[in-house]
């Protein structure tokens, strides 16, 4: 999360601080946290969100810590024909329809192209919580997916992104 947002975040579990504030190969054009309507106010803070997600995973997944997954990472190409604001709204609609309406929090960052790369490479990075979030915090239960089901969801998200972008 710190790397994607080019921020400085502290991991409460390890005590380590990750500082990517000076990383500038790809500028962050937009950064935001999207949460379900009934999420607690602290969930809008990137550090609080991911530290809580890690705590929930440790607390509710004691048997399989070594295979615990806190978030799903998704990279998405955006359209260079659109303005930054149009791309942000497009991304926001997709996030709302696919994730926050279903109880998941999303950490979204829009990056510009590399200085020396293709200047049309405007893209977004999404970190989606694996547990739903409500006023009490993260759910003790999370959806378990095998490779086949995850592949089906990825195909669903691709189709949903195509429909949202076409709209």
Region roles according to the model:
Residues 1-167:
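N-terminal nicking endonuclease/strand-transfer module with a His-rich metal-binding environment
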């Amino acid at each position: 999360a710190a790397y994607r947002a080019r921020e400085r975040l502290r991991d409460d579990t390890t005590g380590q601080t990750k500082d990517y504030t000076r990383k500038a190969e790809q500028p962050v054009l937009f950064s935001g946290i999207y949460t379900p309507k009934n999420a607690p106010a602290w969930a809008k803070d990137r550090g609080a969100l991911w530290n809580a997600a890690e705590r929930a995973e440790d607390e509710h997944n004691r048997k399989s810590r070594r295979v615990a997954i806190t978030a799903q990472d998704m990279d998405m190409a955006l359209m260079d024909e659109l303005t930054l604001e149009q791309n942000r709204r497009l991304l926001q609609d997709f996030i709302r329809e696919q994730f926050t309406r279903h109880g998941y929090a999303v950490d979204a960052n829009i990056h510009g192209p590399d200085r020396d790369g293709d200047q049309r490479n405007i893209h977004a990075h999404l970190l989606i919580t694996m547990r739903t979030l409500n006023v009490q915090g993260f759910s003790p239960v999370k959806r378990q997916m095998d490779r086949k089901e995850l592949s089906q969801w990825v195909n669903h998200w691709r189709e949903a992104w195509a429909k949202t972008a076409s709209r």
